């Protein structure tokens, strides 16, 4: 890996990604809260953006680790997803995602869901490739 600690930190900060979404009825379950599968899809989406901004490589999701549903996300609320690269290796990296929920007409957020997503950089043949030049 040919990257300095300073460059790594600069890339991590520059790749931090925020996405805000409204929770509409078509994204909810029979409890009138955000469907877990939709939450995970949104989390994968924001994490691949952060990972790509960090590496500027073609990446594939290889795992999602320990998704914790801490608070319900009711229909009609706003969520903010925040993704940041937390570690990287030769061909892989991990992104932590926090999903915060807030009422549509109230101030304040609380953490609703957290999880970590792992990615591998791949070449045009879908074989692992170094994230940074060696």
Model regions and ranges:
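HotDog/MaoC-like acyl-thioester-processing domains
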Residues: 3, 9-19, 74-75, 86-134
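Conserved interaction-surface patches within small, structured recognition/assembly domains
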Residues: 62-72, 80-84
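Hot-dog-fold acyl-thioester-processing enzymes
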Residues: 2-63, 120-134
